[in-house]
Amino acid sequence: MAFDLADRLQTPVFVVTDLDMGMNDWVVDELEWDDSRKFDRGKVLDFEALEKMEEKFGRYHDVDGDGICYRTYPGAHPSKGAYFTRGTSHDEYARYSEDGEINATNLRRLVQKFKTASELVPDPEIILSDKKNCSGVIYYGSTSAAMIEARDMLKEEGIELDLMRVKAFPFNLDVWDFIEKHDYVYVVEQNRDSQMRTLLMAEGGISAEKLRSLVWFNGQPIEANFIAKKIREREPEKI
């Protein structure tokens, strides 16, 4: 998927894991290779497509409204599809320009491209409890196993939780919808600075009061007992 996204969005895609996953043994499903799998190269104009084009090819021209422009491979056509651009401001046809409005148009296109990316990245994994009006929890990475165990522990005590495991950034609409449906949400992180919480506040305009930080950073894998204890201590507040 990372390769497909990189080609479709024409941008680097980072696959990030945490230290626990990188240094310890984990039990996972056996890898199954599919020889019939084809890579999604995204919006590419080949020889036939360039031959049929009546309009001029614009390397930075957003014809579909999703912020992603069509591209060509070197040598795809003897006279069409080639372009030369520079690192400074340019127009939709890769021509150098110092026009402020042209530069602003390019930047607005990139904003739309970022929104499109949020629709293509993996959806979060959401686990809802049977109880309504319960608290929400956001987590990611190797926190998953401890979080599920902590959820089960708290459920036995009558504390129900809705869970959401974030899998990608930029965040899609499911992330914002989950937060919106809860009065407050715990953000469980193995990160001293609670960077996921900060990112959620910055990207979604979420208030600091709504996102409750729960961090673990002693160098060891996070423990279910720790998560359960911290949530148990704060649940009676019921803001």
For each predicted feature, which ranges?
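Flexible, low-complexity linker and terminal segments
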Residues: 3-239
